[in-house]
Amino acid sequence: QKDIAETLGISRATVVNYLAEAREKELIRITLAAPAFITHRLAVELCERFGLTAAYVVPDEGADTEDQFARVTRGAALWLPDLLAAGDNLGVAWGRSVFDLAEALETTRTEDMTVLQLVGSMATPYGFTAEACSTRLAQRLGARCLNLHAPAILSSVELAQALRDEPIIRIQLDEIEKLNKLLFSVGTIKPDSHIMSAGLASMADLDHYVRRGAAGVICGRFVDGEGRAIDGPMEDRMIGIPLERLVGLPMGILVTPGHDKLAATM
């Protein structure tokens, strides 16, 4: 921006305004070169330690918590289109990280792609519900969207099973298991975490899972430090993809901004 301003003899603020207007009119698209982030020393170390295919590390120097969050979700939004291809069935979890990524995505078009909502609906005070995440992402990618039209959790095992047995719900559950790629984040196990505020888990539920070694939450289900599902009072009452179906996928795309998610992620 500085170089452009000096060359044209205008202020940097004017350059920023011109660029913003050009992006809104879809005259230009600004991207970051992925190699600059996947060859970062920390990215290389993460790949070596955890056996990852690639890691995209966004620097956080000089950024406060909100800025760090925004940098990571914007960086993930820039990289995501390069990871997708025609014919993909992209399974999508829910949460602020996923929703903000979708909001930051440039509108594009990928042929024959389907975005799958992996977790049922919930009563959350936030805007990033499961259906909002999948719908917004599909809109940005120009993809088909398959929403899961059922509650994420029911009051009883019997009611949950009855809903799963309904033909229309059964079809949707069968469809979401056709995913070949997964976009997700890891939730924390704090009392003010999203799984609590969304009404999926009670304090009694949280205590149960924490006592059994819970380290984080994936797709609304508690997992231990190795990413393994923990049995408890919620599993049979939930409607969504089973965690075992997420193991061994061709690609899992984890978006993890913020130091508060470090323990759950590692």
Question: Residue locations for each model-derived region?
Answer:
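Short glycine- and Lys/Arg-enriched binding-loop motifs that mark or flank ligand-binding interfaces
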Residues: 22, 87, 91, 223
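N-terminal active-site beta-alpha-beta segment that forms phosphate/nucleotide-binding
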Residues: 2, 7-8, 17, 31-157, ...
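Conserved phosphate- and dinucleotide-binding cores of soluble alpha/beta proteins
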Residues: 2-9, 14-20, 26-32, 122-266
